[in-house]
Amino acid sequence: ELTIYYCIDDLASSSPQAKRIRQSETRLLREADLVFVTSEKLRERAARVRHDVHRFPFGVNFTEFEQARHAATDPQDLKDLTGPIVGYVGGIRKEIDQELLRDVATRVPEATFVMVGPLQADCSRLRMPNMVFLGQRRHEEMPQYIRRFQVGIIPYLLNEYTAHIYPA
C-alpha cells in the first residue's frame, strides 16, 4: 500500500487557515511514498521538504485537438459571432482579473471575449456587449471551442495563489 500526494494548487495561499494547511502539507510531504505536483513552482516549494518530487502536469488529448482542427461545424453558441474571438477556458472565479478584462474588452470592442467555464464569482462588472459567458461545457467539447479562438488568454490576478497554478 502506498500513500501518494498529488498537489495541484497552493491551497494555503488563499486560505485564512494557511498555517494549519502548511503544517498538514509538510507532514504529508514527509510521510507520502510518492509526491506529484502540477507546476514547477509547486515542485520548488515541495522540494524544500523532500528532494524526490515529480512534476506531473495536466494532460492534453492531442488527437481530439487535431480532429477539431478539421471539424466542419462550430459549436452552436459560437456560430453567430463575428470578428476575432479572445477566449478563456476554465473556472470563472475570484482569481480572474476582472479589471484587466474589462479594460482590454473596452479597448478592443471589435473582439468578442468568450468565457467558457462555470461561473463561480460575481462578474456583473464584466457584463459588456463584447463579453460572452457560455457556462460550463463538456471536457471533450473544449477543442472545438478553442479552435475558434484567435487569442487564448489566462487572465489571472498576479498573487501567491495564481503563481502556483498550472499553467502559469
Language-model segments: residues:
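A short helix/loop element that forms part of the nucleotide-sugar donor recognition site in Leloir-type
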Residues: 66-80
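Glycosyltransferase donor-sugar binding loop
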Residues: 112-123
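Conserved donor-binding/catalytic core segment of Leloir-type glycosyltransferases
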Residues: 77-96, 102-105, 113
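Nucleotide-sugar-dependent
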Residues: 140, 144, 154-168
